[in-house]
Amino acid sequence: MRHRKSGRQLNRNSSHRQAMFRNMAGSLVRHEIIKTTLPKAKELRRVVEPLITLAKTDNVANRRLAFARTRDNEIVAKLFNELGPRFASRAGGYTRILKCGFRAGDNAPMAYIELVDRAASQAEVVAAE
């Protein structure tokens, strides 16, 4: 019986799944939008949203926790210097999933996962230039 077992297996063992979501979380933080399959996007939400919540309070302990979960100093810096302050007034719901059809090879449902204030932040960068 699978009672109280949360999360998707995605046909991977636990270490592969952990490494995949660590890499995907880093890519999402770095690029602020990525394209992946719909089940992976839904599962990635459960990894990224707590990281952004952690980044809203900048202290050494939280930075170390974020590094333990991402293993990338560049990602930790962006989380705490950009994303934490950007989402300071938002109480959760930092990501958006947009369905975008089906993959050609295997007809897998595809989706974009993005950070919700991405368009506004990109517009500010263009205006600053």
Curated annotation (Swiss-Prot):
A cellular component annotation (GO) from this entry: cytosolic large ribosomal subunit
Entry keywords, A to Z: Ribonucleoprotein, Ribosomal protein
Gene Ontology molecular function: any one: structural constituent of ribosome
One Pfam family from the record: Ribosomal_L17
GO biological process, any: translation
PANTHER family from the UniProt entry: LARGE RIBOSOMAL SUBUNIT PROTEIN BL17M, RIBOSOMAL PROTEIN L17
Family: Belongs to the bacterial ribosomal protein bL17 family.
Subunit structure: Part of the 50S ribosomal subunit. Contacts protein L32.
HAMAP family: Ribosomal_bL17 (MF_01368)
Name of the protein in its database record: Large ribosomal subunit protein bL17
